[in-house]
């Protein structure tokens, strides 16, 4: 599998771009598919300005020594996106490689693309996002200490902080499945700043797992968001928040059929 270490727009500093899947998440996903070789080629300004013909000769032929090239119908390469799938099909016989062009899948009469996924993700439409991606959208990280509020009200939680480049859904509460220690647990996850108990504006991911009672500090977890429950909100009291958290947990269990 050949890909770039960043998306082309990231070369433009004035256009900050967030990623649906980080590089580390992408590597793990590719490995799970049985792909044993992943090339993350450095995308530089020089490469961005490389002529399409030169890209074929230098990258596809000289560096990759490709015999078969598989691309999507909307694949473009080279300066100004001048190269495309048709160019590869036409040039292939001359350079000794075959080009396979894969048609895009559709969902609800709309072509599936990263743009489509982004549009649904920022709206919190997790069911649609997960269908488009072909797997649950997830956030990964190392569990770190929080403010211990969950333990005080006997609803212990795990806190992780996603990479700044990670594209997140709206702040709110979600029904979730979390992987830890090679097992999966149902739970409820809050994304946001926890305004009732904190004045910190840093966005974090806080998850309460059902039927997990071990110490998770320092462990790597993967939180899969399945259903949006409600927006994050500030409650008038700790008691009101605690009551709502219990309600959220029950709702999540019903959504997850636990």
Which ranges hold each PLM region?
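Residues in the short beta-alpha loop(s) of Rossmann-like NAD(P)-binding domains
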Residues: 5
């Amino acid at each position: 599998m050949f890909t770039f270490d960043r998306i082309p727009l990231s070369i433009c500093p004035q256009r900050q771009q967030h990623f649906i899947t980080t590089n580390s998440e992408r590597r793990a996903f590719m490995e799970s598919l049985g792909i044993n070789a992943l090339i993350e080629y450095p995308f530089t300004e020089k490469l961005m300005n490389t002529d399409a013909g030169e890209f074929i000769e230098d990258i596809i032929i000289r560096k990759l020594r490709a015999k078969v090239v598989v691309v999507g119908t909307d694949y473009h390469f080279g300066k100004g996106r001048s190269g495309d799938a048709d160019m590869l099909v036409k040039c292939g016989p001359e350079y000794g490689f075959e080009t396979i062009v894969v048609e895009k899948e559709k969902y609800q009469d709309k072509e599936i693309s990263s743009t489509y996924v982004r549009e649904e993700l920022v709206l919190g439409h997790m069911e649609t996002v997960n269908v488009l991606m072909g797997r649950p959208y997830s956030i990964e990280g190392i569990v770190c200490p929080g403010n211990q509020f969950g333990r005080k009200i006997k609803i212990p939680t795990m806190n992780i902080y996603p990479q700044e480049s990670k594209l997140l859904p709206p702040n709110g509460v979600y029904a979730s499945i979390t992987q830890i220690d090679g097992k999966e647990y149902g739970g409820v996850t809050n994304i946001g700043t926890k305004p009732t108990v904190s004045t910190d504006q840093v966005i974090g991911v806080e998850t309460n797992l059902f039927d997990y009672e071990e110490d998770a500090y320092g462990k790597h977890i993967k939180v899969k968001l399945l259903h949006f429950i409600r927006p994050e909100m500030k409650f008038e009291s700790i008691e009101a928040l605690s009551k709502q958290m219990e309600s959220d947990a029950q709702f999540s269990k019903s959504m997850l059929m636990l």
